[in-house]
Amino acid sequence: MINRNHRPLRGVLSDPDEPAAAAALAHRLDLPLLTEPPETPALFLHHSRNGLALRSSGSNAPGPIRVSLDEGRQGQRLRQASLKRETLARACGLRGGRSLRIVDATAGLGRDAMVLAALGARVTLIERHPVIAALLADGLRRARRSHPELAARLHLVEADSLQWLAELTPAERPEVICLDPMYPAGSTRGAVRKDLQALRELPDWPGLAPVDEVALLALARASATARVVVKRPGRAAPLAGKAPDWQLPGRSTRFDVYRGLAGD
């Protein structure tokens, strides 16, 4: 979810409605506590009564980015979710009355994970960037109040996917692992929704090395008992140059499906 066009992350904006929460988050992330938005173009976190949001300052800045089960396109997608409408669900092998254990190893804002949970899957979300993990944690906290049944099927882990998958015991291995890595080099910015561009512009975090996509795909296949599903732009090369066992095309993206090896 991170690219080279970074913008500075200035800190956490204190809010009269949530001053203690803003201060606690700033302390945990080791970021400055702001009393007003940055004057120059930059990113900042804002903790208000509406939840935690990643915001941008400057002209033509997109609106706040937060994790929500009710707002905008995501809310509409969840309300309309069905096995027939969601190509991702079919790629994962979801069927009516069947509850799968799925790991979303590149969770991002958790939008696909929420849809899978709405369709009955139990989903573990793995996110390694502390800022994105904080957005997810806040969204799931609010979801436990507004959508308790759905939220109960979502479990967030702030960790590096390679390390987390490597430590799974045989009994803990999921049926399905989903990967949605950053769009490959050469993809146009137009391929990325405007409300997600700020997320892609987050600066690198200390201690986080670039994702080794070859190792991640190999370990995901070794850890999944049924399949690995990789979300790709429609015309992009397969992840790590590894041809999938089969594909399911969508409008602008496709799902490359690899047979899991842990069930052999």
Swiss-Prot record:
Gene3D superfamilies: Vaccinia Virus protein VP39. Specifically methylates the guanosine in position 1516 of 16S rRNA. Keywords: Cytoplasm, Methyltransferase, rRNA processing, S-adenosyl-L-methionine, Transferase. The keyword Coiled coil does not apply. Its EC number is 2.1.1.242. GO terms for molecular function: rRNA (guanine-N2-)-methyltransferase activity. It is an enzyme of class 2 (transferase). It is found in: Cytoplasm. This is Ribosomal RNA small subunit methyltransferase J. S-adenosyl-L-methionine binds at residues 111-112, 127-128, 180. The lineage of its organism: Bacteria, Pseudomonadati, Pseudomonadota, Gammaproteobacteria, Chromatiales. GO terms for cellular component: cytoplasm. The keyword RNA-binding does not apply. Belongs to the methyltransferase superfamily. RsmJ family. It catalyses: guanosine(1516) in 16S rRNA + S-adenosyl-L-methionine = N(2)-methylguanosine(1516) in 16S rRNA + S-adenosyl-L-homocysteine + H(+). Pfam families: SAM_MT.
